[in-house]
């Protein structure tokens, strides 16, 4: 900023601004001046563009007009939300000195920094979505990655071993803000991500990190958290914690532990798999028609966020899964009673975070009170549920009768938004406050009595007593009667049609009332702060309660979904394999207008790979995806859309389904396809579930076929993964004859004339034909193009039996499977009965056939 070059030429107020701005050069500074937050110089220009507000000038300082933009303090949340959504950070600078006693500019300081990853304000957060701050670190041995949800205190770290795993973690967590070291080598991994923040190297120093974390948790070492031997993760966590403290400018008591996320604890899904399975986001980037949209009927925002975390991190510990299954089964008869009560609990998790940060507002405390009021009813309903896990949740939930009583006494029923407006603390809670309020509230009665008395004394019927924010209390007399005003009336203000006066008695009362209002407000703020001190010692128990309530919400929701959508409880088995009876796609069955065709699936060590053939639109992709989604649902502990499911251990789910050009990275469809395939072949194991759809279609026929064949061979023979391999290369249906553990299945279609009906039913064996031209006709390709395609197909078939789709034995199949028109001569011959012809008739037929050829 050029303004700093001639610092001494500026006014004292602008010097103060420039000093504060120099401490936060990269971010916008909201500088409090009275009822406005002002921005100056480059900040003003940026803010005017980002917020679409007027850019004006404020006088001159150092001989130059100062660009300025301002926003009213009471509307600051709306403007902050806009800036945060655009990835901006804002330093909030408040007046902390008293203007009445200040010599020179009022003392100001930055009280907090609002950044996309550290927001906790309700207005700035998406209710049903986690908002994560993350830090990434890299050395020669791999990556370190840490995430913090400041609105709940959830602190996690991991150590992804390679680039693919790191990319998958970034996709899964989708941080709002990402801190990285200034020498970070893999910039291509994070380029284009929102909220990137470059940090100095020393912030990632391991010893500092250990010191910071021990200080935060009040421990001597980190052994108890299981992170002692995770140096890369700790480097990231140390930087992240320091950044959170710097921005919040306060202690963070709700961050009490850190958890190590290990690969072996959950089913790993790479970025492509999460995208293709449309877990919480569809391929178009929306939330409709996703797995979460079907499964998430939770009634609290914190429950919704927990369910989405479960969906993105399916657990492999069968003890946890069996416990969840048992709980869902036990709760099925109780959902109708529990859900309306749970809905009243609200977002206790985030309210507690704001309490810890001391930014909770009066309505937060009122909502907390309302949540506490639901606990007795919830505990009473759960008491009759015969399930140990449910009873454990009930205990963890607690009751907090004392805190409920405290908030019922302290906070009025419907408090205002902000404590600075007063009227938050209930009457009867504090005797001194009640006295000051009585004095302030008695003003109305006093003024009415004074008005009646003065009218009678003076005989002036236009006399009125009132109050004005600028001039205070006054006695008003119309211009026509003002000459009759008593001698002790001192003129205070002249209006067009009236005169306003003050008398010593009224002035004295005014001082008393204004003093009492000020004292009442100051005492109210003090009592409000003391409430925090009374609540915060219970923070740990309250956070446990919020976690239990969120988990209960998720499990009650899954119980309701299982009952409503006719799901069944899957069985876990020890050996790799998946056996599904009448499986359904959880999302597709909800959007179809007609009944969904359920299909079986059988994968086992003896039947590891299914080669899936059939027409386009026949349902191959749906069949494959539904298998992966059923597996994923089973591994969050949910019931699943099928009649019966048995499922073995799964370590990873891979999908190579569909592809689009990655133009931004300069990668073609085929390059994207091969990159994803390489990742699968390098990382899949015999416990992995692999979906491969149309491998090799992005290149020439023989190249594609060769690649598809080699990939299938590798997966079946070497890796031995559980694989669903969909293809249009009919040559691949020969694989079961050449290797063990491979089987053919197909999806059928029926033709009638020029129309085609897809049966969506999975049958054993290979498909007998393809239906490419029929699907093209169905899509509306012009008839002359279809006709020309048929001609070309016949030409190709006559040249080479392999040029188009072939049967397993190598003979050519018609893609449309409409037989060629029969020759009239052949038709006539077929209708002839040679034994019934006379010699004369036979000769006539020879001439007739000759003419037909």
From Swiss-Prot:
Transmembrane segments: none annotated. GO terms for biological process: DNA damage response; mismatch repair; regulation of DNA recombination. ATP binds at residues 614-621. GO terms for cellular component: cytosol; mismatch repair complex; MutS complex. GO terms for molecular function: adenine/cytosine mispair binding; ADP binding; ATP binding; ATP hydrolysis activity; ATP-dependent DNA damage sensor activity; damaged DNA binding; DNA binding, bending; identical protein binding. The keyword DNA repair applies. SMART domains: MUTSac, MUTSd. The keyword Zinc-finger does not apply. Pfam families: MutS_I (PF01624), MutS_II (PF05188), MutS_III (PF05192), MutS_IV (PF05190), MutS_V (PF00488). Gene3D superfamilies: 1.10.1420.10, 6.10.140.430, DNA repair protein MutS, domain I, MutS, connector domain, P-loop containing nucleotide triphosphate hydrolases. Belongs to the DNA mismatch repair MutS family. This is DNA mismatch repair protein MutS.
């Amino acid at each position: 900023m050029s303004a700093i070059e001639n610092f001494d030429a500026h006014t004292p107020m602008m010097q103060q601004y420039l000093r504060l701005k120099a401490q936060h050069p990269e971010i916008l500074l909201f500088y409090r001046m009275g009822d406005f937050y002002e921005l100056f110089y480059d900040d003003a220009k940026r803010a005017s563009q980002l917020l679409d507000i007027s850019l004006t000038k404020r006088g001159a300082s150092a001989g130059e007009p100062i660009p300025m933009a301002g926003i009213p303090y009471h509307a600051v949340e709306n403007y902050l939300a806009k800036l945060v959504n655009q990835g901006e950070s804002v330093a909030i600078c408040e007046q902390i000195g008293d203007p009445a006693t200040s010599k020179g500019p009022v003392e100001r300081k930055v009280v907090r920094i609002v950044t996309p990853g550290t927001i906790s304000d309700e207005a700035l957060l998406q209710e049903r979505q986690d908002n994560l701050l993350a830090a990434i670190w890299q050395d020669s041995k791999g990556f370190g990655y840490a995430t913090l949800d400041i609105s709940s205190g959830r602190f996690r770290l991991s150590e992804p071993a390679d680039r693919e795993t790191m990319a998958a973690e970034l996709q899964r967590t989708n941080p709002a803000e990402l801190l990285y070291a200034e020498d970070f080598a893999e910039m291509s991994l994070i380029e284009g991500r929102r909220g990137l923040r470059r940090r100095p190297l020393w912030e990632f120093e391991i010893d500092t990190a250990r010191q910071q974390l021990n200080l935060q948790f009040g421990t001597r070492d980190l052994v108890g958290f299981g992170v002692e031997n995770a140096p890369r993760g700790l480097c990231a966590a140390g930087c992240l914690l320091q950044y959170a403290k710097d921005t919040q400018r306060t202690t963070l008591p709700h961050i009490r532990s850190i958890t190590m996320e290990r690969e072996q604890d959950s089913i790993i899904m790479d970025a492509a798999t999460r995208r293709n399975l449309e877990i919480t986001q569809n391929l178009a980037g929306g939330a409709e028609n996703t797995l979460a949209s079907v499964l998430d009927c939770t009634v609290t925002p914190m429950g919704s966020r927990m369910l989405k975390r479960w969906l993105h991190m399916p657990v492999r510990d069968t003890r946890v899964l069996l416990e969840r299954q048992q709980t869902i089964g036990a709760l099925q008869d109780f959902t109708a009673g529990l859900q309306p009560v749970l809905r009243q609990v609200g977002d206790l998790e985030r309210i507690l975070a704001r309490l810890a940060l001391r930014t909770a507002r009066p309505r937060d405390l009122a909502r907390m009170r309302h949540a506490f009021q639901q606990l007795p009813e919830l505990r009473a309903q759960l008491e009759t549920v015969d399930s140990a896990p449910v009873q454990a949740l009930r205990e963890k939930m607690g009751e907090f009768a004392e805190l409920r009583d405290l908030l019922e006494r302290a906070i009025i029923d419907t408090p205002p938004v902000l404590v600075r407006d007063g009227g938050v603390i209930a009457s009867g809670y504090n005797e001194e406050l009640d006295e000051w309020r009585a004095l302030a509230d008695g003003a109305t009665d006093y003024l009415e009595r004074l008005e009646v008395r003065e009218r009678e004394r003076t005989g002036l019927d236009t006399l009125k007593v009132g109050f004005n924010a600028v001039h205070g209390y006054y006695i008003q007399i119309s211009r026509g009667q003002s000459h009759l005003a008593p001698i002790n009336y001192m003129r205070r203000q002249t209006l067009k049609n009236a005169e306003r006066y003050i008398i010593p008695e009224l002035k004295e009362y005014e001082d008393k009332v204004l003093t009492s209002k000020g004292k009442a407000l100051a005492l109210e703020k003090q009592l409000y702060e003391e409430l925090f001190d009374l609540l915060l010692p219970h923070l740990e128990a309250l956070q446990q309660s919020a976690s239990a309530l969120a988990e209960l919400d998720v499990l009650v929701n899954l119980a309701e979904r299982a009952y409503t959508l006719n799901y069944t409880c899957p069985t876990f088995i020890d050996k790799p394999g998946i056996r599904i009876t009448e499986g359904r796609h959880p999302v597709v069955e909800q959007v179809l207008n007609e009944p969904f065709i359920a299909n079986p699936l059988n994968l086992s060590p003896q039947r590891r790979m299914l080669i899936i053939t059939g027409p386009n639109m026949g349902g191959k992709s749906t069949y494959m995806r539904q298998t992966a989604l059923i597996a994923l649902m089973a591994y969050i502990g949910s019931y699943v859309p099928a009649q019966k499911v048995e499922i073995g251990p799964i370590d990873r789910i891979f999908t190579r389904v569909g592809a689009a050009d990655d133009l931004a990275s300069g990668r073609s469809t085929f390059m994207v396809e091969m990159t994803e395939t390489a990742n699968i072949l390098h990382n899949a194991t015999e416990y992995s579930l692999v979906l491969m759809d149309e491998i090799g279609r992005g290149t020439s026929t023989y190249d594609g076929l060769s690649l598809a064949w080699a990939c299938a061979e590798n997966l079946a023979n070497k890796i031995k993964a559980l694989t669903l391999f969909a293809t249009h290369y009919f040559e691949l249906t020969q694989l079961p004859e050449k290797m063990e553990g491979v089987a053919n299945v197909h999806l059928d279609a029926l033709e009638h004339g020029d129309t085609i009906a897809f049966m969506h039913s999975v049958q054993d064996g290979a498909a007998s034909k393809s239906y490419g031209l029929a699907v093209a006709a169905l899509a509306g390709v012009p008839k002359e193009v279809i006709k020309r395609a048929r001609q070309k197909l016949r030409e190709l078939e006559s040249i080479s039996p392999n040029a188009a789709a072939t049967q397993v034995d190598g003979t050519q199949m018609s893609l449309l499977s409409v037989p060629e028109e029969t020759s009239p001569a052949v038709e006539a011959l077929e209708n002839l009965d040679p034994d019934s012809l006379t010699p004369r008739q036979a000769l006539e037929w020879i001439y007739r056939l000759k003419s037909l050829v």
